[in-house]
């Protein structure tokens, strides 16, 4: 009876020789591995505005230079992870880079940070999706935590059925979200260029605003940098790509970075033009869609796809966590159970463990996204920083052709990500202090 139920839910077992058929194309990989990063535009620009609004609406123009700074950081991270993919074609990302160049303990810190971050990816994304859902259907509010837990179980079961099936199902909502936002930005830009959209800026660029300090701007920048969570996922899953894996992974990474940069700049720029400010009962993205598209079918399409991608962003964690756990298990830092493939050739044990831990987090934090995001964003900048400086050491030791330019790029990127991490730590210490306790325990446990 149990086996029959298992086959109904998960599907028939696959032979190991079918593993090569589990490799995914660039088209599917962009959806399955980029949903986390791309979905962050739904809250990243809003986080910048929320921070600046402390000193008043006139400070909104600072979102423009801050968005440019985030774009520069995105370019640095994309370049860094492009180099990491070619240097470490078997995957592992920041874990392999740190372990190989900085030493075992730093590698374990990077690996532990990423594992924790992937758990938080699932918890944050699912909680955000549940928030959006209950906002649309208020009668479900009292069941928000239960809804979030059920959504985790749905994504968990989808991944237990196998990677290719998961990628096929999840690719459609992600591309609908991308197309919806790109069309919205193009229409909005056209209206601005042709004078159809009256400017409602809160203040002109360059306006001196009392209360704005370097500390506030850095805090706003770090909040905006939450839009970059998930950028590293592709480097951890190179072996999931069809051959040639590294080349396909790099092309997917560049496509993701380009789309993310376009969406971020478009949303920030149009939000400034329309004078949009954060409101308690709605989101910045929702306000922008309403201004540009009107409250019609197109508006609800953007809202619906936003909800879907926030939920499906959790799938990035379900893809990257098992790959990283398998790499660390092969290095004897985690139980061998994490290297075992299930009936459908996925790392079933990792998938189940990740789902259970994410559900526990959602219950502990009562599904409150605002309390999870600081931990989430802070944790991801640890492996970002270690990966960058690990590559710096690699270039110094190897001194291969073009090493100086690569070294400078990684050194600048590493410095920026370290500064962002410290800003998070200092400005939001009361929310992120568990990172300082939990990560050392994880490393010692390895």
Q: Predicted regions span which residues?
A:
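Membrane-interface "cap" regions at the ends of multi-pass membrane proteins
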Residues: 1-55, 79, 90, 98-105, ...
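Extracellular loop-to-transmembrane helix junctions
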Residues: 3, 49-99, 104-111, 124-151, ...
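C-terminal membrane-solvent junction of multi-pass transporters and transport-like membrane proteins
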Residues: 30, 337-349, 384-429
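TM-loop-TM module centered on a large, flexible mid-protein loop between adjacent transmembrane helices
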Residues: 103, 255-313, 338-363
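Loop-to-transmembrane helix boundary motifs in multi-pass membrane proteins
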Residues: 104, 144-149, 240-263, 327-363, ...
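Membrane-interface loop-to-helix entry segments
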Residues: 155-190, 254-255, 373-386, 405-416, ...
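Helix-loop-helix junctions that connect adjacent transmembrane segments
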Residues: 175, 179-229, 427, 431
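Hydrophobic alpha-helical segments and their helix-loop junctions in multi-pass secondary transporters
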Residues: 176-203, 267-275, 385-400
